[in-house]
């Protein structure tokens, strides 16, 4: 169950982040609302990650710790990306970092879980 919560929350964070970036010029209020909803999903990701860490540590504790750090970095990069967008500063670098870190984190997550819940 926690695997599904974790996966759905991560997908929601990525979708909400991209949507917030796209709608900022049209609706600052909508942007702020999406940013707040994103933060709720951070809590879900952290809680579900804590519940699942025992399984990934069995696979490889080094990779599990690295994945935890990458997850925290993703949250930090999303916050920086959205705050830079709100301040109307260039976001290209953070967008590139966001894509790279998300791909690494998702790859590690599926490796450590053996593909669960998506490929099982």
Swiss-Prot record:
Tree of life domain: Bacteria
This protein's UniProt keywords: Cell membrane, Membrane, Transmembrane, Transmembrane helix
UniProt-listed InterPro entries: UPF0344 (IPR010899)
Xref: Pfam families: DUF1516
Compartment annotation: Cell membrane
Nucleus is among the record's keywords: no
Ranges that cross the membrane: 3-23, 33-53, 62-82, 92-112
GO cellular component: plasma membrane
UniProt KW Nucleotidyltransferase keyword: no
Membrane topology (UniProt): Multi-pass membrane protein
UniProt family annotation: Belongs to the UPF0344 family.
Protein name per Swiss-Prot or TrEMBL: UPF0344 protein lin2366
